[in-house]
A protein has these predicted regions:
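Short secondary-structure boundary/capping segments
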Residues: 37-38, 169-172, 194-197
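Serine-dependent carboxylesterase/thioesterase catalytic core
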Residues: 44-50, 55-57, 61, 67-177, ...
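Conserved loop-alpha-helix segment in the C-terminal half of the alpha/beta-hydrolase fold
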Residues: 67, 184-202
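Short, conserved active-site loop motifs that form the nucleotide-linked donor/cofactor pocket
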Residues: 178, 200-205
Length: 205
């Protein structure tokens, strides 16, 4: 297991992150290692979750790409991603609705905070989840090891305190195929916080 960092990435990496590109392009860029390996679609549904403070627009390019490959793609349906009460229940219902509509399991793809949602949904909706893929998501380690903490607090209206029990719960991967795509040059999340523990059904790319 990688070390557990307590500090966010360097300010220089954060500056590079901010100037890299608009949200939509950045989301697609983060997904490129996975996109290069995606096989032609079989028509099964995929829900894509945006990062903190982002909306469905940020995942449009990724959804369009997956749609061209033959997957049935869906946005998360909740507008801008803010850590407010009721979000997880609404996400849960959307997975159930999409799975019921297609009569098939759903792949869950999440960027940043959206990936944390995807993992938790995969744990609670294993029967409806085909796989989980996260893009630069901080599901492992200390809540202080991200440059998005202040934004999270402002949008959620509450302080982001480190809770060891919650951290351990988030660290555990869903019991479905789970892939984490991360970058050591990530300016928002310390890359060590995006690593799955080694297991037959997990991988880090």
């Amino acid at each position: 297991m990688a070390e557990n960092p307590k500090r966010p990435p360097s300010p220089w990496l954060l500056l590079a992150e901010g100037g890299r590109a608009p949200w939509e392009y950045a989301a697609t860029l983060a997904a490129m290692p996975w996109l290069n390996r995606v096989p032609p679609g079989d028509g099964h549904p995929v829900i894509v979750y945006p990062g903190l403070g982002a909306s469905e627009l940020s995942t449009r390019a990724l959804r369009s790409y997956l749609g061209r490959l033959g997957y049935a793609t869906y946005d998360w349906g909740l507008g801008r991603n803010r850590p407010v009460p009721g979000v997880m229940e609404a996400c849960r219902q959307r997975v159930l609705d999409v799975a019921s509509r297609h009569g098939r399991k759903v792949s869950l793809v999440g960027w940043s905070l959206g990936g944390v949602y995807a993992r938790e949904l995969g744990k609670h909706l294993q029967a409806q989840t085909r796989c989980v893929i996260t893009l630069g998501s901080p599901f492992s380690g200390d809540t202080r090891a991200t440059n998005a903490t202040r934004a999270y607090e402002l949008m959620g209206g509450r302080p982001a305190r480190h809770d060891p029990e919650r951290a351990e719960r988030l660290r555990r991967a869903p019991n479905v195929p789970t892939t984490s795509i991360y970058s050591k040059s990530d300016g928002v999340v310390a890359w060590q916080c995006s690593l799955n523990d080694a297991a037959p059904h997990t991988e880090n790319v």
